[in-house]
Amino acid sequence: MQPGLELSDHIATITLRRPSAANKLSPEDLPALIAHIDRINQADDIRVVVLRSEGKYFCSGYDISEVRNSQNKGSSFGEMVDAIEHCRAVTIAVVQGGVYGGATDMALACDFRVGSTDAEMFMPAARLGLHFYQAGLERYVHRLGLDVAKRLFLTCERLTAMEMKGCGFFTHLATPQELQAQVDELTATLSAMAPLPLFGMKKHLNLIARGLQDSEAIARDVLRTVQSEDLQEGGAAWREKRPPAFKGR
């Protein structure tokens, strides 16, 4: 079954729905996921995206036998992951059980990664004879650092949940029983923020991490928030000690 999409209030949820195969992704899943991200980007009211999966495992990556076919068709796994990273809304990956192969890059493309203490990760590309794609290599280095990237890609070492938290793969860690509460808390926090600075700072922080910062674009986005109704609302809510009602303008 292809990944599902649910939109509710300010939150979009993308769910991987192939638990019997450890949520391994197939060729038809790639354009489906890209289409979900496109729809989210067009929904002005969506502020947070939760990427999750059914069953014991988050995702076992992509069917290795389909890698060549997906490249030839022009809709590669890497393009799908890039779409997740460039999503306008803030993204949260909810990782339980195992996250393997390309699925590790899917998670790294998200802004936050909330992991269960029963999780583990494994990048078997070198063991399988596959050279990972450029954007994925870059993401590993930007997010985790060169030494950790080499450790994972070149030795194919498995990491426990605690090791994943220690190296920065997980931004949050919770027991299986507390995982959903942790996700709900983070989602509520993010969805309550003012959309203009939330989206703008996410975008520019990612560009800065890649050495692609645009000073003029940052200045324009700063000015846009200074002139926004939401800045006035935020100040009023602070003075009146009430939750702000941001409108994204």
Predicted regions: what is each one?
Residues V114-A119, F170-E216, E229, F246-R249:
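C-terminal long alpha-helix characteristic of the crotonase
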Residues A236-R249:
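Terminal low-complexity tails and localization/encapsulation signals of metabolic enzymes
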Residues E138-D147:
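Hydrophobic, secondary-structure "cap" segments at the distal end of domains
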Residues C156-E163:
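Acidic, divalent-metal-coordinating active-site segment for phosphoryl/phosphodiester hydrolysis
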Residues G4, P31, D45, S53-H86, ...:
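Glycine- (often His-adjacent) and acidic-residue-rich active-site loop
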Residues A83-G129, R158:
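Glycine-rich beta-to-alpha active-site loop
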Residues M1-E54:
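Conserved CoA-thioester-binding segment of acyl-CoA-metabolizing enzymes
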